[in-house]
Amino acid sequence: MKKTRCALCYAVLAVCFALLLAVSVGTGSAALSPHEILRILLLREGAGTAAYNVLLKIRLPRVLAAAVMGGTLSVSGFLLQTFFRNPIAGPYVLGVSSGAKLAVGAVMIFGMKLWGCVPFGAVMTAAFVGAMLCASFVMIVSRKIHSMAMLLVVGMMIGNVCSAATDFFVTFAKESDIANLTSWSMGSFSAVSWGNLRICLAVIAVCLLLCLLLVKPIGAYQFGEHYAASMGVNVRRFRGALIGLSCLLAACVTALVGPISFVGIAVPYMTKKLLGTAKPMAVLPGCFLLGGVFCMACDWIARTAFSPTELAISTVTAFFGAPVVIVMALKRGGGHR
């Protein structure tokens, strides 16, 4: 019964994923018909035309980034929730995304000031270092604080400190760079380029493959550290791999499109409820698909709701994701009475 439910959910998610991909590519300030899209993609017709440039240089990389980054952030959230054994953990709430944001902001601001440009590889490295530093601090605190509520407060305080430090660094940026930095810091898919997207896709593909190889240890760890150790899992190395993969995935997203809120918490929860299971072999691909659907839908709303004005992606993800987290927190609180 559960296998049938999972298969049906995957099929529905795959159809929604494909439909949203098609709708997002075709709609916007410049509408493109399915006929135009197919001719450009399959026959490469119309090179140099407005439709060709809009589709291949702006719309397609943006939509693909929304699909992949949404799935990536959801998987990152699932790994963090497994690590802390709490469904309210996530890269944004625990300050991991904010740490990556601070490091990237510092590198971009001072790199542009000193050298005039910053390689995307340096941006990704900075994001990973910032994410790992914040995650390490949260791990140290988690050993001393056994209340998840207090740990979340600590994570939010880390996020506030990192955001304040980023705003401080922005005061040293060139006026020409401030608008781009502000847009990036609020989360946006609008500046995605094929070159940067390819780098992120390569890193994400390796990380997701490693996640699939860790499916059995993750399943054992869900029953507790002692059970995992009894099943032959090297818990210390496994925990290091789990937090490292989660931070690297979150760093890829932050480096490319900036911090995005609530996706890493809301989507894993919705995936488990949808599939009716918490088994990692089922949840991991489900998280990726639902995360892609969620982010594509939010990006489409951000682009079209008040066109030509564009909303920050985190504004839309928070609008739809926050109620899910509130419901989750209420149910969790009710279960502990």
Identify the role of each PLM range.
Residues 1-337:
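Alpha-helical transmembrane segments in inner-membrane proteins
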